[in-house]
Every structure is written in structure tokens, then in C-alpha cells.
Amino acid sequence: RQRQMCIRDRPMQGLKEFEDLEAALPKLSGVIQISGCIDAAKPHMMYSIGNGSGNRIIVTFQEQKAKELAEEYRFFDPNVAYYPAKDILFYQSDIRGNVLTAERINALKMMAEKRSCTIVTTFDGLMNPMPSPDQFISAVRKVAVGDVIDLEQFTRHLAELGYEKNYQVQTSGEFSVRGGIIDIFPLTEENPFRIELWDDEVDSIRSFDAESQRSIENLDEVHIYPACELVLTKEERDAGIARILAEAKQVSEKLRGEMKTEEAYRAKSAADQVAE
């Protein structure tokens, strides 16, 4: 790899131990253990070793440690993202808030857009299934002023991307349609944006404040990233829901036959909630 020299590298470059390490790394293969570095210096050490090597991934043992490491590493490299694992215990709360999903989508976006970035995660996060780069990039929808849009098809596509339709956009992951005005709040953006149509042609695009509804900036084009990691078509989603409901019905009936009415109710309720 070709090192990109930076002023932040200089403290490390002056250390004989670091220079010896750099000289040895190209000759080594497999898992390499480096010891003797205090915790406070680890982000600097990792940055200095990995700088100029394309995309990098840092894996640590615990979520809180990963968050702290991402924040500390950001001092050396602004193109860093924290990728949280999918926590089953807090799955329902994240459905409502989209906080963890937004962090994962932002990490995927960074990998798709940046030539060089650093992702910080845990072993659990590393084992999470995720879409291939081609699948993720192909799901991104670009809209530019002058484009022709089929409104019905476009809103159906937003639903497939994981966006929830609402009367008025208030939080990320929502969209609304009022006549020829489409409001969308991507998980990857700080503010929603408004697409105004003249008949079926995009007349204008601008970002706006979700609370005041005031316009912020006119835009020539926008990229709409998915609001979920697994993008399904309506047909795939309907087939999956039908299968879940059918299996839940079988489980519920079996539990009722065993006089386990409470467990049967919970199984059916969980399936109904997923279907909604």
C-alpha cells in the first residue's frame, strides 16, 4: 500500500518501534499480534498503520467500547462510522426510533460512497447478515430536477425501501404525499427534503426543517437510501408475511391443544405485529 502522509502520522513516524513495525508488517501474514500499546494511543496506532490502505474495519469486544473507539478515531479520520450489532432485546424499540438502523445504513452508505473509510464494530456486528454492495447500491434511488416520476410506482418503491407513509413527515424513515408534493426523510440525512411535481415532472427539490416546515436549501438532485437493510419487493414481503402467519397459526393451534393458552396467544400476537 502507499502511505498517505499526514501531520497526524508524525508523532508515530518518529518512534523507532513504530518504524520497525512498519518494516515488519509487509513480511508477515495471518493474524498479527501487537502488544505494548496503551489504550489511549490505540486509535492513533491503528490510524497510522491503516492510513492509505483503502477501507478498514476495526472490531472490538463490546458495543460501548466500539462507540468510544469510533469517536476517538474520528479525530484522525472523519470518514469513520460505527456499525452496531442487531440487538434482539431492543429490536422493538429500534423499530420505533430507527436509531440503530440509521447507524448501520450510514455505515453501509459510507462504504458505498467513500473510496477510503473506517468501520468500527463488534464481533456480533461483524456476524450480522448484510446486503452485498451491489444489492445495497442498486436499491438507492436517485431523483433529479427534470426527472419524470410515476407517483404511484414511486411511493410503492419508497415502501419497499422501508419508508413508512405518514400524513406529515416528522421523523427519519417517513414519507408523505399531498397532491404533487412528496416529502421524504431518509435515515442518512439530518433534514427531510421535498419533491414538488409539475404534472409528472420533478419541478423542484429542497431540504426543509421537519418542525417548522421551512425550506433550507434548493437541491439539484437527491439520493434516497433504503430505510432498512433488507430491501424486499411487495411480492417478497407478502409471501414472507403469509408464511409467518401460517407457521404462527400452526404453533398457536398446537399450544392450545396442549392447554397452553397464554403461549398460544403470544405466538399469534407476535406474528400479527410482524404482519402489521
Language model: regions and residue ranges:
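Short, small-residue-biased leader/transition segments that mark boundaries at the very start
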Residues: 1-7
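ASCE RecA-like P-loop NTPase motor cores
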Residues: 8-276
